[in-house]
Amino acid sequence: MSFITLNNFFNTNTFFGLLPEQYAPFDPLIDVLPIIPVLFFLLAFVWQASVKFR
């Protein structure tokens, strides 16, 4: 039940701000930018696995 509520919350535009109209071409880039720190976090595990978690 709470998942449905959270899902509806994240789908509305009240949580995420809208970019001004002149920045509209950058909208797809803005959607991807928050994922970059997660990729660095996963890269740390891949790096440690490659050196056998020394």
Curated annotation (Swiss-Prot):
Q: What is the lineage of its organism?
A: Eukaryota, Discoba, Euglenozoa, Euglenida, Spirocuta
Quote the function comment for this protein.
One of the components of the core complex of photosystem II (PSII). PSII is a light-driven water:plastoquinone oxidoreductase that uses light energy to abstract electrons from H(2)O, generating O(2) and a proton gradient subsequently used for ATP formation. It consists of a core antenna complex that captures photons, and an electron transfer chain that converts photonic excitation into a charge separation.
Sequence intervals crossing the membrane: 29-49
Give the similarity note: Belongs to the PsbK family.
> Which cellular components does GO assign to this protein?
chloroplast thylakoid membrane; photosystem II reaction center
| Subcellular locations according to the entry | Plastid, Chloroplast thylakoid membrane
What name goes with this protein?
Answer: Photosystem II reaction center protein K
Give the chief site where it resides. plastid
> Which top-rank group of organisms is this from?
Eukaryota
Q: Which Pfam families match?
A: PsbK
Query: Which SUPFAM superfamilies does the UniProt entry name for this protein?
Result: Photosystem II reaction center protein K, PsbK (SSF161037)
Q: Which GO terms describe its biological process?
A: photosynthesis
